[in-house]
Amino acid sequence: DAIESLRASRPWLRHIRHDRSTGQSAAVRTGVRHARADVVCTLDGDGQNDPAFIPALYRALDEAGATTGLAQGQRVGRKDTAFKKLQSRIANKVRGAILKDGTRDTGCGLKCFRREAYLALPYFDALHRFMPALMVREGYRVVHVDVVDRPRLTGTSNYGFLNRAFVGIFD
């Protein structure tokens, strides 16, 4: 396993895994609960999120001060199909009209957030879609950072039109 081989030269690296696939929200929560740092940064594993933007997200969070719980990436130059971009645009408009949290793109996996703020959020599946609104509800501010989207390098999306729409509505 690649992670195990890296641990020999990186003693700080830990390998945490679930016994079975549990979904994005559960994976992030497990990682955050095991994190030792005060700030946690996330990105999707399909290659669309460029890790080069993590320092900018961290800086934005740090400069905004302790009352800011989340620096949320917002994709520019999306590399998805026109249909997928249309779905996201509609979903984000509906979501934004209801939640009024000022976030135009909750689907971006690039985020930096205060561990303490994240752990104060109520946990539910699909939490990652609502992090900005939940941070605001808990009294934190949210800052947004434009990040450049890249074409997907690996895997396939687990989110389609119907499950994205219905899960979002029910949540």
Explain the meaning of each model-derived region.
Residues 48:
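A short, conserved beta-strand element in the Rossmann-like catalytic core
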Residues 4, 12-34, 39-42, 51-129, ...:
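Acceptor/aglycone-binding surface of glycosyltransferases and processive sugar-polymer synthases
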Residues 137:
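Flexible glycine/serine/alanine-rich "lid" or loop that lines and gates the nucleotide-sugar donor pocket
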